Amino acid sequence: MRHPRDVLFAGEKPFPILPAVDHYAGSEKLMRKALQLQQELGPIFDITCDCEDGAHAGAEREHAEMAAAVIMSDDNRFNRVGARVHDVTHAHWRQDMEILVGRAGSRLPFITLPKPCSAADVQVQIDTLRQIERQCGLDREIPVHVLIETHGALREVWQIAALPGVESLDFGLMDFVSGHHGAIPGAAMKSPGQFEHPLVARAKCEIAAAALACGVVPAHNVTTELKDLDYIRNDALRARREFGFLRMWSIHPNQIVPIVEAMRP
């Protein structure tokens, strides 16, 4: 009897092996708390230090420096602490990269790029990242995670997924719905609407299909529920079973374990 792996089409590019949860933390207090939890549970989830929404206006440099220090700290035992930089239209995105790569590049598992409006936007930031890596003498290329949360990014999601260096496509539900200026109701930002509204479901299908075809990990948006573990688990189950997402964001420690349980094969 031949094993199924010997006769079934194996696909093209294999997926990167990533933890099932990407946990976002915007302040140093929350970053440290997440690191403590990661030490207790093990590297079953990534931590992303948020230098976009987490940084106060005028304090972007200090915030990026703080995030780099957290990444380089002894508390980071598993080297699974990444960072999200500002978007390509923001004045500080290059500075974010220079600080993060210059101070913590050797331990950065990924950098997340928010709000691109095209594949060209993503390419600009990847090219700059590679240039900074060379300037810093880094002997590796840091993987990139790309947020799909604009009309333009969704339109070019297949091109984005195929860009060298892209490791994950992340759906930004809130900004995507907001970008429709009321045409999609607010109820589509939470369950069950986020799985049932045709325009949102279409976006999730496009992102997952492009990612899976290109050997990239599709990451689902956060759930707004923070306390009801069954609700959280069900959101993750629907993302995994109905839409093919292999990873999901969390914004509260309570969300991590239910998502991990739901994302298991």
Question: What are the residue ranges of the model-derived segments?
Answer:
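Expand to "…catalyze enediolate/carbanion chemistry for C-C bond making/breaking, isomerization
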Residues: M1-P265
